[in-house]
Swiss-Prot record:
Region (Disordered): 19-39, 125-152
Bias-annotated ranges (Basic residues): 23-32
One GO CC annotation: nucleus
Stretches of the chain forming a coiled coil according to its record: none
Quaternary data: Part of the nascent polypeptide-associated complex (NAC), consisting of npc-1/egd2 and npc-2/egd1. NAC associates with ribosomes via npc-2/egd1.
Gene label: npc-2
The protein's name: Nascent polypeptide-associated complex subunit beta
Domain NAC-A/B: start-end pairs: 36-101
One GO term of the biological process aspect: protein transport
Compartment list: Cytoplasm; Nucleus
One Pfam family in the UniProt entry: NAC
SS bonds (residue pairs): none
Length: 152
């Protein structure tokens, strides 16, 4: 019982700032949310560049060098064409190219088509390797040999 009380005293002592009983408990310091301040700075900078909103954009896809795609569904897009600046607002999701294939084919450029071909070839090779691995699991029996006698 006294062991439990000692543990409680240690825990209580770490939560107090001062030494005495009348001192207030320590308050947890929290990091401020900076996204609102950063967003305001970004909006001010974009306003200086004179961006204009672009309406009726259903989706935005950004192709990465590793073959994945950053997909924005129903984003807000602002653009300043003379400054070659585009701002995309929304929740971006990392997706593989194969997840978006039926609807994304008309958006693919020559580089992306090449990566899609490589992806298809690697997928076919993986299928072949899996079949070969399944066949290699069971060894072939050799006629005339008794493996049980070697174990003993």
């Amino acid at each position: 019982m006294s062991d439990v009380q000692e543990r409680l005293k240690k825990l209580g002592a770490s939560a107090r700032i001062g030494i005495g009983k009348g001192t207030p408990r320590r308050k947890v310091k929290r990091a401020p949310a900076r996204s609102a301040g950063d967003d305001k700075k970004l909006q001010a900078t974009l306003k200086k560049v004179n961006v204009q909103p672009i309406q009726a954009i259903e989706e935005v896809n950004m192709f990465k060098s590793d073959g994945n795609v950053i997909h924005f569904a129903a984003p807000k897009v602002h653009a300043a064409v003379p400054a070659n600046t585009f701002a995309i607002y929304g929740n971006g999701e990392d997706k593989e190219l194969t997840e978006l294939v039926p609807g994304i084919l008309n958006q693919l450029g020559p580089d992306s088509l090449a990566s899609l071909r490589k992806l298809a070839e690697s997928y076919q090779n993986m299928q072949k390797n899996e079949k070969d691995a399944e066949e290699d699991d069971i060894p072939d029996l050799v006629a005339g040999e008794n493996f049980e006698s070697k174990v003993e």
